[in-house]
Amino acid sequence: MSVKVLKRVALCSFACMMAATAVAQVTPYGWRGPERNGIYPETGLLKQWPAEGPQKLWETLDVGKGYSSPVIVGDRLYITGMNEDQTKETFSAYTLDGKRLYTAAYGTPWDQTYPETRTTPAIVDGKAYVISGSGEIVCLSVADGKEVWRVDGGKVYSRKTGNWGTSECPLVFDNKVIFTPAGDVTTMVALDKNTGKELWRTKSWGDTGAYVSPMLIEYKGKRQIIGSTAVHIFGVNPDTGAVEWDFADWGSPRNATGWASIAPNTPLFKDGKIFFGHGYDIHSYMLQLADDLKSVKLLWQNETMDTHHGGYVELNGVIYGSNHHNNSQGTWIGVDWNTGETLFDSNWENKSKGSIIAADGMLYAYNERSGAVGLVKPARDKFEVISQFRITKGSGPHWAHPVIVDGVLYVRHGEALMAYKVK
């Protein structure tokens, strides 16, 4: 029976669909799909688009500036943004035809480079959990956006961040909300999802925070949280907060540049293996988790796939993503899951990079520079773009990861959000 990433986080009608894979109470209401691996459980999607692209159902230009993704729950869409003068981060609710129901301010943005909101909300049992760029974790009612509780990670935990503030989607399961403030006080904390009261905290490495959303896995009948700081990737007991392993033995390739301590992508987990990359011209790595979940060992590293912050997906033994190439000449990559061999290194849209997700056996790539959205047929030897169209509304880098729910592709570009029929 295959092992899957767990996120026991909500209203779990979706769990019935996943019963055969032994994933209990998985929900799609958060970051990069129900398992945080970029794969959306859709069926019957188009395998080719019209020349002009899929049918646009609606667009709105008022979500506020940001790089976060929308979250769809029932007949509502939720998304974070910023107010007009960019002094507050906001949480908004929309109908599924693009009509805004309300907008509520919840936190203080990052006050340096790229201040736009980053947190994709986690929606659980009528509550939204968000983290501001300045490190405030806030619980809101999705009915009206009113605040339920908040914890200031800077004041309470002496949060320590890198150059771009906090970028994390909270992990919510059981009665817990998981947050990674990093710094000298602690690394990761669990808060009561109803009150914000601290339930446990891990030890501290004194490390700077990463830009990684934690995930909950199950392996050999045991659960574990996998998280990251700028230097450490680690596993935590979800009940006690005890750190059960950590890995920071990256060697000289990782320390070769000034960008070595970034960590901008959520890891992939499958069958006891953890794939993780730090981007910024630094190698990616595959770790093997021990059967008792108490240690890891390095299986291989790959010099080509240094994904910036667009994520990666694994399909049929191939890891797909884009690479950084000194932030100017990205390409699209395929790497063998088992061996780490680079299978292809392909140019698309004039040396580009961006985000990638998967659904119904196809890949969806979003070019961060040109705004091209590509429908890609998975292959072991090439990056085969079957159809593509271009996002023309919105402003800034195309950094928000796309989302597919109920046959609709949602693409954000800054203050603009578009919905396309892909079924």
Where in the sequence are the language-model features?
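Sec/Tat signal peptide C-region and signal peptidase I cleavage site
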Residues: 20-24
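Noncatalytic, solvent-exposed loop/strand surfaces
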Residues: 25-423
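Bacterial N-terminal signal peptides that target proteins for export
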Residues: 1-13
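Repetitive helical segments and hydrophobic/amphipathic motifs
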Residues: 16-17
